[in-house]
Amino acid sequence: MYVKAEKFAQGGRSIGHLDDGRIVFIDGLFPDEEGEISIVDEKKDYCIATALSVALSSPQRRKSPCPFSSQCGGCLWIELDYDAQIQAKEALIEELFSDFPEITFEEPVTGPEFGYRSRARFQYTIRNGKASLGFCAESSNRNVEIKCCPVVDERLNDLIKNPPRLNAWELKDRELSCITTDEGVLYDDRTGWITVNDRRLPVSNKVFFQSNLILLPKLIDYVVSLTEGPKVMDLYSGVGTFSAFLEDRFDVTAVEINKACLSLARSHLKRTEFFTSPVEKWNPRTRQVNTVIVDPPRVGLDRKVPEMIASWKPDRIIYVSCFAPTMHRDIKRLKELGYEPQSLKVFDFYAQTPHVETCVLLVREREEDIDTVSIKVDLEGINIRQNKQLLPEKPTYEKIKVYVKEKYGFEVTSLYIAQVKDHMGLEKRANYNIGEGKAKVPNCPPEKAEAIVDAFRHFGMI
């Protein structure tokens, strides 16, 4: 089957159209390229395909610098010229946030496209008495043994060439998590230290820490430059990456649910006040705050958090995210609550992939700037039940599935949609959460829940 790729979709695949008009999401073709494809998943309204050959190649295509990229699948855009990667990421972000015309898109921050990752999770195997490291093949649990990886730190490549001999009890599910520190490479539970902007920060394989230590200082500097005091709240604070550079200038309160993160934060922060709590359940003693910084996981803010932050009436909110779709969802809600997104800056933390780190500044609208209009609606004589055209059409589960597939490139089930509806208190079908014999069924993965919530907003359900 021969297809032309038209543009990138959110998530990094290319979009094309089949002869019957259906959308096809393609791995292995870049925009304006043509080639033979193989359908790997077929639905009523769309398909997923992989390229078998490239007949008409883009001038932005290059030979892969990694001999394992075709098997590993971890670097979806490694055959795309780096300048073209940046342009594509900018275009995708601007498309996603196009419903905020007031946003200023600042110049993206870029860095080295190779050798930037300071941490990795390898698959560990022993064959013929010799240890080796690798990564999972794309959409598979199959291990791809590698001899090098162009995107990781040189010290991690040294580890790939000479992997340690470990006992089974030292591994978790045959995975080896590694992070480079000032002291060397850590692949156990010890604490190490990383120097960022002349300040030492604690890290370990048990907690999250940014993987791009080359661009992290620039992100920190940018966040600090946007912060106004005297009172600052650092929500989802982790090990205190931002608080470390704010506590000497502002009165900082940090909130983090992970006790291991807060333990590390307390080891180096002396002036910050800490709270161990889910952000959505935290009840601050004082609601006086000038700047709120949020750096949530991919799932974004809990649905209660935007209203909670808005009730404190901070002058500004700084939102940092590694997953722009959920950030967009949350900013849409924050705007409804009186916070206008002013600027957006992309940091290319993840070269060779479609992913970026994004920072948005939101500023509270002053009451005198808000125009109010009084509207009187005469409902006398109108029967809402008889005039269903007055109500928005209720989206079907199938429409939600198609929306998610077209925007995010993956599928969601009716079960997952029902679970998210249940979580949000929306009307749903019969209880999908209980299987035969009252057995519980799997919960919706966070990234799919994010996409479903976005679909709810798109269709006006929330």
Language model feature labels by segment:
Residues 394, 443-462:
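Phospho-regulated, low-complexity intrinsically disordered regions of nuclear gene-regulatory
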Residues 428-439:
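Short Lys/Arg-enriched helix C-cap and helix-to-coil transition segments
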Residues 52-64, 70-166:
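Extended interfacial segments that mediate partner engagement and assembly in macromolecular machines
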Residues 396-408, 418-424:
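DNA-recognition alpha helix
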Residues 29-35, 156-158, 166, 170:
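Short nucleic-acid-contacting surface segments enriched for D/E, G, S/T with interspersed K/R
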Residues 4-10, 14, 181-389, 397-398:
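Rossmann-like S-adenosyl-L-methionine
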Residues 32, 152, 212:
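Short, conserved phosphate/pyrophosphate- and ester-handling motifs at nucleotide-, phospho-/glycolipid
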Residues 1-68, 140:
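Terminal RNA-binding accessory module
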